[in-house]
C-alpha cells in the first residue's frame, strides 16, 4: 500500500433517522500509527459516524475506502473481518458468562467441534494482559466485577480480535484513575505498533494527553480538523457548541446557614464492610458533594438512602424525623420525596425499547392516574414542561428513547424524576459520558433546583464538578466519612489529599458540622 494513501477514509457520508439529520456530508481520514480524537456534543453525529464505520448502520449516501479500495460493511462482523473493531460506550458483555467466555464469544477456539477451554483461557489471558488487566481472572463471572473492571474486559475483548483500527467510544468513562493510566499506556503502545485508534471522549485532559489529530463534529457535520494541542480548550468547546463559551459552572449563592433545618440526615449509618458509621446532613437549598477515590462507598451510600440496600444499621432522618426507607417505592413517596439519578442510564434509568413519553411518565404514573386511568391531558402538560425545562432534543415523544443521544437520554432520566417534584435528589455520577454543553445545562439545572428548595446529594468522579457545583463536599475513604470541605476549602489539592487520606488531622464531620 502507498504510504500516502490513508488507511481508512469516509467521504460525503450522510445518514438520517426519519426527520432527524444525524450525519450530513461527513468526512474523516484515519492513518495508521495515530490516535485520532473525535469531539462534539451528544447528538453531533459522533455515534452515528462510528456505527457506520463499524457496520452497525448503513449510510444513506457517501463512500468509504480501506487501503484505497472502496468498502461497504453490511454488518459488524464484516467490519470486524476487515480489522475495524469498536468498543461502544455502553458495554456489550453477557453478565452471566465468564470473562473468558465474553472475550472469545464471537469466535471461540474449538477442538473436535467443541469449545477448547484451555485455548479459550489462554486467549483470554493474553488479551487481558495486552489490555493491562492481567489481574482479572479469566474464569470470574462478569456480573461479579465492578463496572470499571467490566470496561477493562470490554477492551480486552476488542484486542482479542486483532484490530487494525480500534474505535473507543468513551471507553474510560467508567474507569478508575489507575485503570485510565493503564489504558493510556496500552493505547500508546498500540499506536507505536502501527494501529489506528479513533478516540471519542468528552474529557479534554485525555484528548490533550493522547491525541495526534482531532476532528470536531457539530450538527452532523465535521466543522474542524486540527493537530492536537494547536487550540485551547475554550476554542475547542466553542467549535463544539457553535457559540462563545462562557464559564461552565453557575455562580454559588451565599452559604445556607448551619442552623437551617436539615432535610436529609444519616446517623451512624453502616452496611456490611462498605459503610462505616456515616453521619451527615443535607439542608434544603444545598448541593452537597460526595468525594473520594472511586469505590469508597459513595454509591452504596446513595443506594442506602434510596432504600435499595438491606441490613443497614443506624438511622435515616427526613425533616428531623427518623424514617424506615425499606424500598425505592417508599423513598419516592410524597412524605419523603426522594429521587435517584443512577450511574448507568441504559440499564438502571431507562427502558430503551419504550418511547420517550412512556419513560418520562413512568415514575409519576401514580400521580397521573385516578382509578387506574391515566389523565392524558395532565400527562402531556407535565411532559411538555419537562421537555422545555431540560431542552430535550427528540424527533418525537413516541420514538424509542434508545434512539436519542446519550445526553438527551440522561435528560429523560432526570426529567422522569422531576415530574414527581422531589424534595431530595441523589445523583450518582450523572455527567458520565455526556458532552460539555449538556453538562453545563445539568449544572445550571442542579443549582436551579437547589435554589427552589431541593436538597441535593451529588457523587462525582470529576473533581472540577465537585469544586464548581458544591456548597460542601464530604470525602469518603474506605467506607468512612473522613473530611468535610466547605466553600473556599473545596480545592483540587484538598480533594486529592483527602481522597488519599493524607490530610493529617481530620476535620470534624457529622450532624451538620462545618469543617
Swiss-Prot record:
Pfam families the UniProt entry points to: ABC_tran
Domain ABC transporter: 8-244, 256-503
Protein topology in the membrane: Peripheral membrane protein
Main localization of the protein described in the UniProt heading: membrane
Keyword Transport annotated: yes
GO CC terms: plasma membrane
GO molecular function: ABC-type D-ribose transporter activity; ATP binding; ATP hydrolysis activity
Assigned keywords, A-Z: ATP-binding, Cell inner membrane, Cell membrane, Membrane, Nucleotide-binding, Repeat, Sugar transport, Translocase, Transport
Catalysed transformations (reactions): D-ribose(out) + ATP + H2O = D-ribose(in) + ADP + phosphate + H(+)
Binding site for ATP: 40-47
InterPro entries per the UniProt record, alphabetical: AAA+_ATPase, ABC_carbohydrate_import_ATPase, ABC_transporter-like_ATP-bd, ABC_transporter-like_CS, P-loop_NTPase
Family to which this protein belongs: Belongs to the ABC transporter superfamily. Ribose importer (TC 3.A.1.2.1) family.
Record function comment: Part of the ABC transporter complex RbsABC involved in ribose import. Responsible for energy coupling to the transport system.
Protein name, per record: Ribose import ATP-binding protein RbsA 1
Origin species: Mesorhizobium japonicum (strain LMG 29417 / CECT 9101 / MAFF 303099)
Phylogenetic placement of the source organism: Bacteria, Pseudomonadati, Pseudomonadota, Alphaproteobacteria, Hyphomicrobiales
